[in-house]
């Protein structure tokens, strides 16, 4: 009886497997070779597609006004696309052009296929008449992009120095600060290609945020990554007091690296003024806090390409984890300092990771580098500190001629990677039980490019003290390199 039961079970399993395989075969598969195509008005591109068990194809939908612009070639398994020349948002479209001839600038093309089993499957391709900005001639570890509804590309086959070769086989989003910030990411002819849209509420502005794009080798190992800083901000103009400020002869961005604002008029503006945090000498950033007070250690949310959540982890420094190579391959790991590492994330201390000249690990965009301590020397608080500054989370600092707001963003702790933004001026041994009454609301810590000595490097440091309604500024205070701090970029000299 047992043998008969086993035989029946085996037959049923085989039948179920056959049905499953049959269903998979009946469904068929269909996919474009790339997720998107970007064209100029009147431009043409051919995009291939692949299929399994499909007997016929058709274009089932396309953007308005692209009716005659798309030609399906079943034999070549490709679609030829010609971009329209007159668009519904174009001023020329109102000059005698029939309404039905006006085209959308962007939209989705849907290719439908019918399988041999009679099932219908589809594949989609984003088509857009939009500007393509090629940044391949500006190699760096971070790219500032500020144009809405643009396609951006950069070299994927070299590190941020533009010299060291990479065996990049694929690219993917390591993390992004909002879902769908980076769209239609692909590796095309050795270049990273992606699209950034417009802000949902203000469609004349870029969709702002931060992301990290990773390069992977043929085995799927992460071998490099690049920070994309999408912001309505352009530091290229030379106007002091505008998008840049000049301190001690250094032209400096007037906001932190990765920040989406630079001010403290509202709590939203304070939060947007937080940039990203960096461990000294590492090129990859760590996201900012979830709230402007940043006193509970919570990070803002991060997402992958499929809108799933991504988490930051911490790992203690040792001979294996405390290396530059490990840091590159694990950008989502905060390498904490220990007594054995002298509270440096790098097990063997390396003062050359950042420096006076832009290094392969420098996190700033092309033409910019981490500010040295000399750039902050002599800065003082503009105006007279007052009790109302308790909620301002930063100072406007000046050298007597120029000035810039610096947010008090605290730091990521060297021992666990959480965000800490409480300044406690009283030595620990002298504190009473009620230490919260002594804790000050915020402090500012910014890494400099100076190597310092041993396991410590100089940081630019300022704070607010509520007991005296005052504050102070120091430009080169030694801190353990495992701390994560904000960064200001200066033009390379």
Regions found by a protein language model. Give the residues of each.
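Short, exposed coil/turn segments at beta-strand boundaries within extracellular/luminal domains
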Residues: 114-123, 219-225
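Bacterial N-terminal signal peptides that target proteins for export
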Residues: 1-8
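C-terminal, surface-exposed recognition/capping segments
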Residues: 259, 336-493
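Short aromatic-cysteine micro-motif
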Residues: 189-191, 209-211, 238-383, 474, ...
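Bacterial Sec-dependent N-terminal signal peptides
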Residues: 10-38, 120-132
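GGW-centered surface loops in extracellular recognition modules
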Residues: 134-165, 215, 220-274
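A short beta-strand micro-motif common to beta-rich folds, especially ectodomain repeats
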Residues: 89-116, 207-218
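Surface-exposed binding patches on compact interaction domains or structured appendages
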Residues: 28-32, 52-92, 131-201
